[in-house]
Each structure stands twice: as C-alpha cells, then as structure tokens.
Amino acid sequence: MAASPVLAVDNSSVAADQLKSIIERIERLEEEKAGLAGDIKDVYAEAKANGFDTKVLRKIISIRKRDHEERQEEEAILELYMQALGMV
C-alpha cells in the first residue's frame, strides 16, 4: 500500500525539522567549545605568566585523565626502557 501524499509530506517535514534541530544544537555546542578553548588558553597564559611550564601542566593533565593502573604500567615500561639505555 502506497503512502498518502499528505503522510509523505508530514514525514519529510518532521525529518527536516529534526535535522535542523540537530544541526543547530551542534552549531551551538561548537560555539561553546570554542569559548571553552579560549578560556583554557587564557588559563595556560596565566600559568605561564606565573612561571609555570605549560608543557608540564599539559602532561600532568594528560596523566590525570588516564586510569591509575594504565599509568603505572606505562611508567614501569618507561623505567625499564630507560634502564636498558643506561639513562637511569
């Protein structure tokens, strides 16, 4: 049984409305993300102005994001490799 033209238009309209809503939400979130990125940049600039090494700060943040066990395993492997190379 074929869909009636009215039903097809309604479905198309609903899909278009949903698509528009999704696109607008993504655009709004992208704007927020850009704003947050600017805020983060400002905090790093403040840290640098106060004498902190921003590369080290970024590394610490990266480390804190990871699971404790995963971090310990990576540190153990790093230590092993450094010993093998006579670096410690």
From Swiss-Prot:
Pfam family for this entry, one: GapR_DNA-bd
GO molecular function: DNA binding
Entry-linked Gene3D superfamilies: Winged helix-like DNA-binding domain superfamily/Winged helix DNA-binding domain (1.10.10.10)
Signal peptide location: none
Coiled coil: none
Similarity comment: Belongs to the UPF0335 family.
HAMAP family from the UniProt entry: UPF0335
Record protein name field: UPF0335 protein M446_5200
Source organism of this protein record: Methylobacterium sp. (strain 4-46)
